[in-house]
C-alpha cells in the first residue's frame, strides 16, 4: 500500500477534482506561487494556471465571501484560510451567508464550496495560529 502525507493526499484530491471539473478552483493566501503555508498546493499553479489557483490578499473575510459568492454562480471553489484561528474573521460569510443562502432563497440557491483551514498545526506558531476549532463546524 502506498504511503503519503496528509498534504500529499489533499493535493491529489484537489488536483483530481480540478481535472474532473473545470469549475473547481483554489483560492487563498499564498496558495499559488508559494504553494500554500504548508506546501499543500505546491505545483498546482503550474498545472492549472493563475485563473484556477488564485493568490488572495490577507483577508479571510474576502476569501470566504468570494468563495460563497462564486459558488452561487456555479463555480466550485476550494477556499483555504492559512490557519483555522482566522476562520473567526470569516464567520459572517461562512455562517450568515454561505450556510443560510439556500434557505434564504427557498432552495433555489446552492453554495457548493470547500473551506480548508489547517488547525492545531503543532508548529509552535503561537496563540493565534494553533487553535483547533473544528467543533464549531460540526453542528
Task: Locate predicted features.
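Thiamine diphosphate
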Residues: 1-139
Amino acid at each position: 500500500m502506498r504511503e503519503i502525507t496528509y498534504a500529499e493526499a489533499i493535493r491529489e484530491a484537489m488536483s483530481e477534482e480540478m481535472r474532473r471539473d473545470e469549475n473547481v478552483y483554489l483560492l487563498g493566501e499564498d496558495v499559488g506561487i508559494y504553494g500554500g503555508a504548508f506546501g499543500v498546493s505546491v505545483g498546482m499553479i503550474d498545472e492549472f494556471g493563475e485563473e484556477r489557483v488564485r493568490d488572495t490578499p490577507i483577508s479571510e473575510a474576502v476569501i470566504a465571501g468570494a468563495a460563497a459568492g462564486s459558488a452561487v454562480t456555479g463555480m466550485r471553489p476550494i477556499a483555504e484560510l492559512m490557519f483555522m484561528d482566522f476562520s473567526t474573521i470569516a464567520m459572517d460569510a461562512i455562517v450568515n451567508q454561505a450556510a443560510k443562502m439556500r434557505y434564504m432563497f427557498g432552495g433555489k440557491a446552492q453554495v457548493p464550496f470547500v473551506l480548508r483551514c489547517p488547525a492545531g498545526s503543532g508548529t509552535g506558531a503561537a496563540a493565534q495560529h494553533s487553535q483547533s476549532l473544528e467543533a464549531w463546524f460540526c453542528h
